Structures are given as structure tokens and as C-alpha cells.
Amino acid sequence: MSLLSIPILASIAILIAAIYKFIVYPTLISPLSKIPNAHWSTPISPIWILWTRYQCQENRKLHAAHLKHGPVVRLAPNELSVNDIGGLRTVYAGGFEKGQWYSIFDNYGVPCMFSTWHSRTHSARKRMISNIYSKSIIHSSPALAEQARVILYERLLPIVTSTADSARSSDGVDVHDLWNATTMDFITAYLFGLKNGSNFLQNESYRRHWFQLYHSRKTYTFFPQELPRSSQFFKRLGINLTPTWVDDANQELEAWTKDRCDHTSGFINGGFAAKDSDPANEPVVFTTLLSGIEKEQKKGSESVLNDTTLRFPELSIASEMIDHLAAGHETSGITMTYLSWQVSQDLALQDDLRAELLTLSPNMLLSASSKQSIPSSKDLDNLPLLHAVLMETLRLRAAIPGGQPRMTPYPSCTLGKFTEIPGGVRVGAQAHSVHRNAQVYPDPEKWDHKRWLDTENGYSEEQRRERDRHFWAFSSGGRMCIGSNFAMHELKLIVAAVYSNFRTYIVKDEGIEQTDGYTCGPASNKLFLRFERIIDHSS
């Protein structure tokens, strides 16, 4: 045998090994090979799903794949998607951890509760603040009640009234901008207190600047989120796959939030909070998180948060605050946009909704004769039409319709009929598909609020149970949206305040179609409605 044949044989052996590892094994032998492929290339390459995400077509293409192949689909050599209740229960209530994908939600270089990878760390963070986002606290909080009263009666409704009375009312107002301003003022008031929160409703020029910074970064998350190692590699070579102005925008948003935190900290530590008799100025979330961290610090090195939250307490608080205000304003703003768009197409529905809202005591009719009050949360929750309109909007136009990835546990797990799925496989579900199960939601692309009106839809108990089980706008399990009760409460208050006093008409809805991705609003980021004041002469 010649010496030349040795490297040749070695090359052949390497080639055979490579073919086995990257083609034969993933395609024919791996436990994942038994799972249907979303695309012919998925067993050997992630290019299809990466390109799909880059083109912002993930939600629709994954939904089509599930319709064709069933509840478990393979998206890449090491990635799966699930779309049934059993899969949701396994993944989101079965100890599947988060992974690298969520690190993009870190702020100031430190994780927030949402971006933490491991459940133990997440649970420790969640215990600090979960009580103040509970339904009982949300419904009974004097601070939130007064914050809502000021935001609705002293900020939002005067703006809506002025646009309705304006000679240019026929031009309409961009309610997507208006609703986002409203929800931002709501969440920052609960975080920092009304005094130290935002006033985006009355500061139009700055809110437009802030929102422009916030939304301009969205199209540049693909590389750091889906290809973080490649992004870092090219960055070391001096090639930045993300424009530098995106970093500048992030820094400005972080600086703005840190300024809110510093003012709130001074308000508390300077003794001003204790002397302030206005409940609206109570920084509910900030104070609770600060107290939780101080309590956790007593555990010292034994705390699971010792290397993160306790090491950088101020930045950890700021990271949590920016996560809450970002998610808290945008998702609810999107929901209000689509809700108002839907009901603006049906004046009879608006009249029925208003009639129901006027049964509240106190109701939310504008009146110059007395100080306006906020109706009780319990009474709001007992309004079936209001609840139905909101639930159907959250179903069809979930603000976060995209995938919620997790990592399979080691050594292996089972998903549906597929066994021995190895650890470290990315797997997720998306509300876009869960909410479009035609067996649960007939004609799923149709907005039909009567799905949620049990006195009218004729559903059996089993149908109602399945309908509720498949509602996934806030995810599920121990890491579901912590702010779901807050969101439902503020949205019902905003709808009640507006539709007790006004009718809305569509002026311009070009670009109202929902984008594709993780958090998704209108493609145009706009919706123009005209408001018409309803004068109640009996009040």
C-alpha cells in the first residue's frame, strides 16, 4: 500500500462518517426521524426554518405544516413544533427549560425574569412579585384604581372628546398610537407610581419619538436571536450584522427606564413615598421587587439568585421594569387596536356593548356634575359581552402569536406518540396555530365573539371546556404571562371608558393585516378611527 493511499483512505473515512452523522443518522436513524418533516430538508439542515423566520413567515408556514402533518412536526435537525393540548401540557408544564433564544430579552447585560433560562431561578424571581399581579390584588388595589381613574378621565377621554369635537374629526385619529400610549401610562404607573411613570397620552411628541425607537429595532433581532454565535463571530471580525443605531436606540430606551427607576428609588428612600397621601403615586411593582431582593439578600451565597439578581440588584430591577413596560404596553396596545377595529365594523354590536356597559354602577359615562369613578372589577368581569369581545380578539389576533421555544430535558422525553426524543432539542408551540383548531373554533379565521357567549352559542359543556383549554393568548404553565390579570383588567377598563361614551368608525385601515413573528401588530403600525360622542340626555 502506497503512502499516498493513507490520507486518501482517511479522507474517505471522514467523508463516510460525515455522511452518516449529518445525513443518514438524522434522516433514518434518529428518534426525530419518525416525526413528519415540515420541509424535505429539515432532517439535514436548519436553513428552511431560518429562511422562513428571516422572511417573517414562520407562524403561517408552521400552521400549514401542522394542518398537513399533524400535532408534532420537525422544523430542523434539532427542532420541533407541537400543536395539541397534550403537547402543550408536556412542554409548558413538564419542566422544559428556556434557552439561548431568550437572551435577547436581557437588559443592561443582566437577565429579567422572562429571559432567565432555568426554572429555579425564574421561580425565585417570580415569588417576589407574583402576588401583586394576582387577580385579587389587581381587583382590590387602591393604587391601581386611582391610577386608572386619572389616566382614563384626566388624560384619555379628554383627548378622545377633543378629537370627536374637532372640525377635523373626519380625518380620524391614529388609535394604534393612542392605545399604546394609554397602555404605557397604565403599566408604568403600576410599576413606578403615577408621579414617576410616563405621561405619553399628554406628551405626544416624546411618545412618538419613544415608539419610533422601540419599533425600529424589531427587524434586526433575527441574527442575534436565531444565530447568536454567528453574530458574535462576525462581530469579532469587525462585521456587525446589526446596525450600530439599533444599539443606540436600545441604550436610549434603557436610559429612559433607568431614569424612571432612579426617580422612584429616590422617591422611596427619601421618605417622600411614605408622606404622599395620593394612592396613585404608589410604585407598587418597584417597591415589591425591591423588598423581595432585600429579603433574598439575607440568604447570601445560598440564594439561587446570588450570581445574577443579588450581584447586580439595581440593574436587575431596571431589567425587570423595562421588560414589564415593553411587554405590558405593546401587547395590550395591539389588542385594543384590533378590538376597536373589529367593533367599528358593527354599529349594532357597539350599541349592545354600550347598553351592557351602562348597567355598571357606577358606570363610566362622562359627567361634569361629579368626580368620575371607576366601576368595580368584579362588576366588569360579570359583563359577558365585554368579556366575549375581548376574548375573541385575543384568540384571533393574539398579540404574541409566535413560538414559545423550550428545550427538551435530558436524557429524553416523549411528545405524543413519539418516544425517546433526546435532550437539548428546541421545541415550541404558537398561539397562532393553537387558536385555529377548527374542531374547537369552527371557521377559525372568522372573528365571532359569540363563541364566548354561552347563552347564545349553544355549546355543550365539553365544547366550552375545549374552547377554554385551547385559549393560549397568555401561554400556560409556571412561566405563563405574569401580567395576564393586569392586561385583562386594563383592557376592560379602556373599552368601558371609550364605548360608554363614543361610537367609532373606520377612516383608514390600510395595513391592518397582522404581521408574522413573535409579537405582531398591524403591518402599517397604524389604524385611523373617527370618534362620535354619544350624548346621554338622561344623565
Region annotations inferred by a language model:
Residues 331-344, 494:
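Short, small-residue alpha-helix embedded
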Residues 67, 72, 374-392, 403-430:
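Cytochrome P450 C-terminal beta-domain/meander region
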Residues 196-197, 347-350, 460, 466-467, ...:
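Cytochrome P450 heme-binding "Cys pocket" and the immediately downstream C-terminal segment
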